[in-house]
Swiss-Prot record:
The lineage of its organism: Bacteria, Bacillati, Bacillota, Bacilli, Bacillales. The gene is lacC. This is Tagatose-6-phosphate kinase. One of its GO terms (biological process) is lactose catabolic process via tagatose-6-phosphate. GO terms for molecular function: ATP binding; phosphofructokinase activity; tagatose-6-phosphate kinase activity. CDD domains: FruK_PfkB_like (cd01164). Belongs to the carbohydrate kinase PfkB family. LacC subfamily.
Length: 310
């Protein structure tokens, strides 16, 4: 069983418009409302590839119940921790080939709720074999909250796949308890190191070998359409991917995380892990719906990916 954590989920509302008129009335014919958040995208893809998965995090109010009901309808198991605050909305206005987003900050978690979730998580940890943590921390939580979670996973021998960025990731990496896998994109990698972006192979090797990453088993760096670069213990890999027709790249990173987590759960070798992860990321990009993959195209893309030890 895989446990996914989305500590700041949202109801994602999509408004498609022919054109966005500022300071005027805009009427929409169709509205899409989904259970959103990076970890829930990971959850959906894991469910689609047939992995046993359980979703958790904080939810509150009517919007929180909306998320729970959406997962129920999809047949996805969940064990959220209820809070006093209201789960947030995130609005995307799709217009003229562009996407304008309005993102609510979300509820503030108080100390009692923060401590309560840790106890809740410890109970869930007893019955899972891998944990995938995705996205930002909600307001009110200490910057080391993910580190507290990872410490408990390490004590139980449960691998952690972590997808976050900025100060939150920095705090985790400065903690003695490390995640098994991190997945920064190339910009996030160099921002962590406070270095100018450099896509050369030697620079990437030096970057992921910095002391900050010591103890992290897998570092998988997304290079967008150029594929990926990875370090597993002391081995480096370059992942070359085919050119595809991209319909919606949103959620592709989350689908990649789903692939990594699935491969970790099933103890797959390095080559298959990297190919599975990138295949699922590309499959998501080919679909209009975020966090959805068409597995009919899986084998074709999987066989086109080239993984080289460098």
């Amino acid at each position: 069983m895989i446990l996914t954590l989305t500590l700041n989920p949202s109801v994602d509302i999509s408004y498609p418009l022919t054109a966005l008129k500022l300071d005027d009335v805009n009427r929409v014919q169709e509205v899409s409302k989904t259970a959103g958040g990076k970890g829930l995208n990971v959850t959906r893809v894991l469910a689609q590839v047939g992995e046993p998965v359980l979703a958790s995090g904080f939810i509150g109010g009517e919007l929180g119940q909306f998320i729970a009901k959406k997962l129920d309808l999809a047949g996805i198991k969940h064990a959220f921790y209820n809070i006093k605050g209201e789960t947030r909305n995130c609005i995307a206005i799709l217009h003229e080939g562009q996407q304008t987003e309005i993102l609510e900050q979300g509820p503030e978690i108080d100390n009692q709720e923060a401590a309560g979730f840790i106890k809740h998580f410890e109970q869930l940890l007893e019955k899972v074999e891998a944990v995938a943590i995705s996205g930002s921390l909600p307001k009110g939580l200490n910057q080391d909250y993910y580190a507290q979670i990872i410490e408990r996973c390490q004590n139980k021998g449960v691998p952690v796949i972590l997808d976050c960025s900025g100060a939150t990731l920095q705090t985790v990496l400065e903690n003695p308890y490390k995640p098994t896998v991190i997945k920064p994109n190339i910009s996030e990698l160099y921002q962590l190191l406070n270095q100018p972006l450099d896509e050369s192979l030697e620079s990437l090797k030096q970057a992921v070998s910095q002391p900050l990453f010591e103890g992290v088993e897998w570092i998988i760096v997304s290079l967008g359409a150029q594929g990926a670069f990875a370090k597993h213990n002391h081995t480096f890999y370059r992942v070359n991917i085919p050119t595809i027709s991209v319909l919606n790249p949103v959620g592709s990173g989350d689908s990649t995380v789903a692939g990594i987590t699935s491969a970790i759960l099933n103890h797959e070798n390095d080559l298959d892990l990297l190919k599975k992860a990138n295949t699922l990321g590309m499959l998501n990009a080919q679909e209009a719906q975020t966090g959805y993959v068409n597995l009919n195209n899986y084998d074709d893309l999987f066989n086109q990916i080239e993984v080289l030890e460098v």
